[in-house]
Amino acid sequence: MDIQPTNQSDKHASKGVVLVAFGKPQYYWAAYNLAYSIKRFNKVLQIALICDSQERATYYCHDLTNVIDVYVELPEQHIYTNKKLDPGKAKVLLYDYLPYHNNLYLDVDAVCLKDLQPLIDQLIENNAEYATHVVGEHTIDKGRDFKQMQWAWADQLWQHFGLVKSDKIYAINSSIQFIQKCEKAEAIYRMAADMYINNPMPLNKLRMKWGGGQPDELYFNVSFGKNKFKPYEVNAICFQMNREFTFSQIEEQFYLMSYYGGKGFTPTFYTDWLDRKLKAWMQEDGIQHKYFIHRITDHKHADPKR
């Protein structure tokens, strides 16, 4: 990796966006669309791609070479479990592969709508050692149904992972995470990874699986509780299952628009809009928009329909 050493006296010294793509070619396509849109607004902002193989990624999407600054390769054992693709494992093991001191991690199923530099700088200024999209919080006295967390019943989490009555867990959407290389963020990741690998919740006890497998978010949620840690909240991505916002409202209020979940989760009203934006931007740059979102969502690691 061609990374300049971090100057610890300058908290802004090492910062960048981190994307992850491996397995299916469509994830490299999504990574390209997102990276292109980020560079559209800020050409000097560093973007790292954590992938299974730089050679494989650029073979299936040569355009990545125009938008990615740093490649970091994951070992196969951190991508697969019993020869099956395991994205959740890669996400809980992400910490050791982060190339910057201040890392804005983004799931690749999104398009950037404005310059991300102010967001990153604000998170650094606020000393947000770990920040993410928080959707709810829960203590066991509130009952077993943690409505904002779809993965498991609360009482089963408390029992399986040895949480105590005073523990509070936070439900997150891990599509966005700001991660400083520091003791607190490392502790969150280490515990989440240990539970995921060595003490996972049995799949048959999950209320909902992620693409047929383990959801990384569940293990982060529990790790917050066991570490007595409240994540810093960042509301920078628009997630939509219904037509709640106009296009102009999204552009005014958010940095990015996600097309999360499987085919049909995000209305085509929005995904078609994102494709139109990508096409128009690329036409201005004299290139062709090839990686249409519907070609990506058909192959995502997610539940097949809403």
Model-derived regions, located:
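N-terminal anchoring/stem segment of glycosyltransferases
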Residues: 1-79, 211-214, 226, 260-265, ...
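Short, charged, surface-exposed secondary-structure boundary motifs
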Residues: 77-85, 139-145, 265-269
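A conserved donor-nucleotide-binding helix/loop in the catalytic core
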Residues: 33, 74-106, 113-122, 257
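A structural signal for well-ordered alpha-helical segments within the folded catalytic domains
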Residues: 29-32, 36, 89, 93, ...
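Catalytic core and acceptor-binding pocket of nucleotide-sugar-dependent glycosyltransferases
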Residues: 162-264
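Conserved donor-nucleotide/metal-binding helix-loop-beta segment in metal-dependent transferases, i.e.
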Residues: 114-153
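A structural signal for short coil/turn segments at secondary-structure junctions
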Residues: 42, 98-99, 127, 227
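Short loop segments at secondary-structure junctions
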Residues: 54, 98-100, 180-184
